[in-house]
Structure formats: structure tokens, C-alpha cells
């Protein structure tokens, strides 16, 4: 049987033949470092490939401060132009396969991280950590190891939570929830729903992301993916059934959320209903702290509060899915590995305070201080209820973010196909779970070494 590594290599080579060199798909962004030449004999320039806008994401500030602290190293910021982070990684894969210089690379999820480990793209970091004399578990809240090897340092670490329109809450005399279940979330959504037709205001909005189809599953402390660590199916988990019941209750029964069919047909931006007052609540990631104060696409017109991710049962602990993290790695083919490691260590520790946009996985961050810092940099801090965000962060426990097999995207795609049939009324929950379970088992079997 063909191994996973062989299949990945063949796929990458095939893409290169069809697409050609991907260098034209990347853009060197103007930063103080990128415009500098190597004036000193021992000066090193490392290339940092990512998908973010350097100025908007304040990466330029992080890079400038790093270079000030490390005068012998320059960082060239290279943005991979694409519609989203996942698409940008396809361009990264092309660059790697064509022999382009890669030093530091960024990945947006545990799935994309695991895939690149499987490709052999990433350098083990254990020797660098040992040389520095640090223990990973003492430094970071998120474990990135695969079979005991660390191939990345974690960046952002933000939980999923509920955004609430304070105007709508006050109108309905509803308090900001500080601890609640999904049943209570449903009740809020029913109360906040008003009107009919084009004037209807929904109590909540659930975007058609793959992650929305596994809300309750992803909030479990462990075994929170569609496949278990031993590569057996997890499709029959009660938490996956609850995930489907969440969609059923809001979209099909109470109609307190826009239907899947309407979302798809209107091609809505994920934030449009909430920012335009067409939905009173939305489960989103903590990264929205930087946006609810308004940004170029959606100016703020009301105050947003935050509530914890709902629990399945009242007695459950306050676990929440990890909504936003980054994996920062040194490329295995890099000739500047030591410099690359220094950069990702700085970025994933002190760099977050310089960036002022996200909470990081570094254990030594002063969380409340960082929240205040982030809010102060938003367009309209007065529209952000910082105290409710702090309350969420003070009690949240992060669900374990496991490292899935490299073929996990196949499983997610198969499940989403079944969820679509369910949301369009073509099959019930039992059938959806049964067919998903069969597909997960089949995909796992086909991908066995």
C-alpha cells in the first residue's frame, strides 16, 4: 500500500507540474527589515512566510522590536496572497516543493500543522529548547508535540465564546450570562428573536463553517475530534449528537437562527448579521475582541458583551473550544534554523504585547493587562465590554487541542456533507451519525500505513 508520505509527495509534485513556480503568488511586504540589505558580514536575513497583512496585524512592530533586540538578524516578511489562510498554505507547499528559501512558517490550525509535519516540512524544536534550557510545559498553555517532538511553538490562544449585543439584551431585560448551558442559550435566542421576513432579527447566527457543526464536541476536555488518537471513529460520541441538536434546535425548530439554505444562498460574510444588528448573539472566537470595537469592514454601532461558551450540562466544567491559535515553525530546509528559532520564541512570548492584538499561549502573560492593551487599540473602546471578556477568561478551561492524523480534512469533508443533508431536511440525526461513522472508519482504514 502506498504510504501517506508517498501520496503527499506525489500530490505536491503533480501540483508543481500543473501550476508551475509559485513565487509570483507571494509578496514581500514593506517593513523596516524587508527593505534592509545585508550590510554586515555576519548579518542573517530570515524569510517569514505567512498570510497576514503585516501592517494591519502589527507584525511590522513585532519584527522591528525583534531586530532591535537581535541586531545580527533581519526578518523579511512575505505574505502569501490568498482568499484565506488555508488557501495560502497551498502556495507555501508549492514554494517548499520548488526549493524556495523558507525559514519561518505560520500555520492556522492543528490540522494544517499536522499535515506539514507529515510532509517533513518542519524542523524538530526539541534541541533548541534544550539548548535554551527551557521546558515547553513551563512556557506554553498549548501542547504542540507529536510523538514527543515539538515542531512548532503556539501563537494566539483564544477560546470560543458568545458575543452579545448589549442594546438587544437591555431591551429584553436579560443579564449578561456568566455561566450557562446550551438549553439556556436556546432560551435567550428565542427571547431575542423578533419580526418576520426581511425585517426578522434572529436571536443568534451560526455561520456555515465546519467548526460550527461540532460546537459541543469541540468543547469536550478530550476526545473532541471526529477521530480518536488511536484512529478509531468518534462519530458516535454523545457530544457530536448534541452538536447536531444545537443546529436543529436553533435553525429548524425555534428558527431563532438563520437557516443553512439562506446562509448559503446569500453568501453572507460570517460577521454581517451580528454587526448589522440582524442577530443578537453569535458564538465566535476571542479574536473578535479586536473587532467588536469596529474595523474597516464593519464600524461599531453598539456595545458588545461576552459570555462563556455554553455547557452541555449544568454540572460540566467551563471548557471551551480553542477558536484561534497559530503554529509557528522553523522550516526543515532552512539554513538559518537558529535565527528562525530565536524569532518564533520572541514572537510567541514578548511579541504579543508589542503586537497588541491577541492573547497568546505564553504562560507568563498578564492576561488582564493584555486585554486592556488590546481594547485600547480598537477603533472604539467604549463599544467593548472588557470586564465581561475578563470574566470569561478568568473561568475558561481550554479543551485539549489534539493533533489529528494528516488525512483529517477528508473526515471533516465527509461529515460536513452529511450535515448539509441533515440541515436541508434530507435525513435525520441518527442517519447523519451512522453515515458519518461509516465514512470515518472507511477513511481511516484507507489511510493506514
Model-predicted segments: where are they?
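A structural signal for short loop-to-beta-strand junctions that line the ligand-binding cleft
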Residues: 94, 102-103, 132-168, 200-206, ...
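Hinge/lid segment of periplasmic solute-binding proteins
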Residues: 108-159, 303-307
